[in-house]
Regions:
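Class I S-adenosyl-L-methionine-dependent methyltransferase catalytic core
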Residues: 1-103
Length: 103
C-alpha cells in the first residue's frame, strides 16, 4: 500500500483490508489504526479522514480519535527548510483511530 501514490487508489486498496478486518473481528471488539495526513503539490490532503470515512462506510463505529504529536522525526530538518521556501506548514501529528464493530 505504501507504494501507491494516488490517494483514491490507496483508499480503494485499503478498503479491501477494512472489509477483511470487519469480517474477522468479533462483535463489539475494537480495531485501531495509526495514520497520518500528507501533502500533494504543497496542498494538505486529509488522508486520515479519507480512510476513516471508509471504515465508517463499512460498518465500523468511531470510538476515539487520539491525536499523536510527532517529535524528533528524522526528516524534520530537511522539511523545515523546504516548508520555509515553499510557504507551507509541517504536518506534526498522526491520528490513532479506534473503531468498534457493533453488532
Amino acid at each position: 500500500l505504501s507504494n501507491i501514490h494516488d490517494l483514491e487508489k490507496f483508499c480503494d486498496e485499503y478498503e479491501k483490508v477494512i472489509k477483511e478486518l470487519y469480517r474477522v473481528l468479533k462483535p463489539n471488539k475494537y480495531c485501531a489504526i495509526l495514520i497520518g495526513d500528507t501533502r500533494r503539490n504543497k496542498m494538505y490532503q486529509p488522508l486520515a479522514f479519507m480512510v476513516m470515512q471508509r471504515f465508517l462506510q463499512n460498518g465500523f463505529f468511531l470510538k476515539e480519535d487520539i491525536i499523536k504529536h510527532q517529535h524528533n522525526c528524522k526528516a524534520t530538518g530537511f522539511w523545515v527548510n523546504k516548508s520555509k521556501e515553499a510557504n507551507f506548514l509541517l504536518i506534526m501529528h498522526e491520528h490513532l483511530f479506534v473503531f468498534q464493530k457493533i453488532v
